[in-house]
Structure formats: structure tokens, C-alpha cells
């Protein structure tokens, strides 16, 4: 299987991940509370962001398949860390959709596919995923 991402440790608790097909680069820094500079996303920030991105992406796929428009959205993400062991204990997502005319049936479809997205299903069951949808 061909590689799709190249990750380099570049010193000072920083990494660079390159998406090989597009050459897009994501930089991570260790957070200040974990001996880093905190000048970029931390790896755990990316986990929280990936959860939200996955949810909104599968919602878009659902809308396309069901032939309705998914309104643009803005989400706010809160990541809660625990210390023993150091891990993400909770991710809170608030996903706000622009003015829309979605039916209640389509809203329920969108919520269901979001909660069942691949990232949500891949995370440890001990991690609390609190999602607020504002349509």
C-alpha cells in the first residue's frame, strides 16, 4: 500500500506532516503546558479538529446523496485534557449552520451521519464527544 502522508520530526518538539498527493503541509508544536512553544496546532488539537471536519464532511456527502444543500457552517471546538493518563478526555463541538430551510427529516439524517462518522467511531469509547448542532 503506498504511503499517503510523510511525517518529519524537525526538532524543538515540532513535526511537519506532508500530504503526498497535494504537498499540503501541517505543522504541529507541543503545547506550552507540555514543554512546547504552542505556536501551531498540537497533535491533540488535530484530533479534535479531525472529528469536527469528519462530521461536517460526511454531512456534506449525505446532503449531496439526498439532493439537498448543506448550509455553510462554523464550528467551535473545545478539547479537554486529563492528566493521568495524559489524553483527551472530552471534545465539545458546537456546529452552527447559516440560515437554512432544511426539513426536520434532513436535519435528523445529518445529525445521524455526523455522530457515526469514521473519526467518531475510531476514537476511544472513554472519550466523551459532546456535539451541539445549531440549525
What residues fall within each predicted segment?
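Extended beta-strand/beta-hairpin segments
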Residues: 1-49, 60-135
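Alpha-helical metal-binding/catalytic segments enriched in His/Glu/Asp
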Residues: 54-55
Amino acid at each position: 500500500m503506498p504511503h499517503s502522508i510523510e511525517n518529519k520530526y524537525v526538532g524543538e518538539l515540532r513535526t511537519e506532516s506532508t500530504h503526498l498527493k497535494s504537498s499540503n503541509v501541517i505543522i504541529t508544536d507541543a503545547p506550552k503546558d507540555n514543554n512546547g512553544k504552542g505556536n501551531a496546532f498540537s497533535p491533540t488539537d488535530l484530533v479534535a479538529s479531525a472529528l469536527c471536519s469528519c462530521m461536517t464532511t460526511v454531512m456534506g456527502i449525505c446532503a449531496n446523496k439526498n439532493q439537498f444543500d448543506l448550509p455553510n457552517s462554523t464550528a467551535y471546538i473545545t478539547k479537554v485534557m486529563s492528566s493521568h493518563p495524559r489524553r483527551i478526555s472530552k471534545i465539545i463541538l458546537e456546529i452552527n449552520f447559516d440560515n437554512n430551510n432544511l426539513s426536520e427529516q434532513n436535519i435528523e439524517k445529518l445529525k445521524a451521519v455526523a455522530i457515526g462518522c469514521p473519526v467518531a467511531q475510531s476514537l476511544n469509547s472513554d472519550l466523551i464527544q459532546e456535539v451541539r448542532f445549531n440549525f
